[in-house]
Amino acid sequence: MRPTIAPGYAGCMRQEPYGHTPGTPLRIAIVSMHTSPADRPGKGDAGGLNVLVLESAMALAGRGNHVDVFTRSVGAPHAHSLAPGVTLYALETGGGIVRKHELPNLADAFGDQLQRAALAATDPYDVIHAHYWLSGLAVLPVSLSLGIPIVQTFHTLAEEKNRRLADGDRPEPERRLLTERYLASEVDAIAAVSRAEIDVLCDGVGAPAERVWLVPPAVDTTVFHPAPVSSREAVRARLGVRADDGLVVCVGRVQAAKGQDLAVRMLPHLPGAVLVLAGDATPGSERYLESLHDLARELGVAYRVRHIGSLERPALAQLLDAADVVVVPSRTESFGLVPLEAAASGTPVVAARVGGLMESVIDGETGVLVDGRDPAEWAEAVGAILDDVDLQLELGLAGRRAASRRDWQDVAHELEDVYRATAAARAL
């Protein structure tokens, strides 16, 4: 069957996976050149992309598919099992740690290594799924050379990032803009994570609408869920948060695009709140992290700010459950996994009304979306939840219901639809 096609926003069309047609197992190569799915989210360049790659790979393998994941090694090449049916191959390219802005220069060499691995495989791959523009840059020549269909997921787009830069932030380079436009026109299919991303792809990047599919992420509710009261109390005690303090949590890599400065700026308007920042500074954003500490001191709220770095998934789940409110002040997000994880934990979210956050947060149901970046307005939205226990419970219960409607098996089903349709179209 052909996939159904439904109208999207701004005159764009989006393809939505049609049913869950069974078939023979697929051999899938997933490529994340610049960051390994085994890396801890919130550390270095690891974030929601890493979660999506790992969770979808495991779910695809759980459905009987063979999944190989390829990334760049910063040391010797190696391979190891990530989960049953999922093998991670770290390919040696360039040697050592390389700054992200230098990675495009290694794309050809990485692609050569990937092609050798594909040719050495016992059976050919049915599809290659490239995550992020750097992976697409490396993979497209391999796809053309070996005749393997390529599916692209961008995760972030330079077109949108450059529209919403923080003051003093460096714009994405022209090379990335041009590469994303070229990839959008040449790949067999694009798996977009939100309708907001589809709008940018079709209206700003020039992606052919008939090749764009909507496959949003999910959340693992066996990890992210409400915990016993004793667990919440233990987390708050470790953070030095008193019983009558409001615990506000902001999770993400520390960088200007994530907007943690706004979370700090709203604290003077929330005298009874403690802010916890969970995440490490991305390479090149160390000064931004320092500026957050400077800002907190200038505003007289440093004693109410805790920066705890990145956390393993179980510890993050405990933190989100212990929070009274989770804030997501990002300048742009293609989707935003943290709001889903908070919702599954039963914790209300206050987020910026931008991009995919308008889909991962249901305004007035699982949280509140805020226009603009006025600290007083953000504090008002957060304070309204902190001051109303009944509202906290109402938003939290709705969040749990919303999060339970979709899991990573649904994502795997839909990706299979994309892969099979793409392979069938290439075979015509």
Language model: regions and residue ranges:
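Carbohydrate-associated surface elements
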Residues: 196, 218
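Conserved donor-binding/catalytic core segment of Leloir-type glycosyltransferases
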Residues: 242-258, 264-270, 276
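Short alpha-helical donor nucleotide-sugar binding micro-motif in glycosyltransferases
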Residues: 318-323
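Aromatic "clamp/platform" in nucleotide-sugar-dependent glycosyltransferases that forms part
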Residues: 331
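Short hydrophobic beta-strand element within catalytic cores of glycosyltransferases
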Residues: 348-352, 361
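Conserved acidic donor-binding segment of nucleotide-sugar-dependent glycosyltransferases
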Residues: 363-364, 368-375, 384-389
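N-terminal subdomain of nucleotide-sugar transferases
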Residues: 2-90
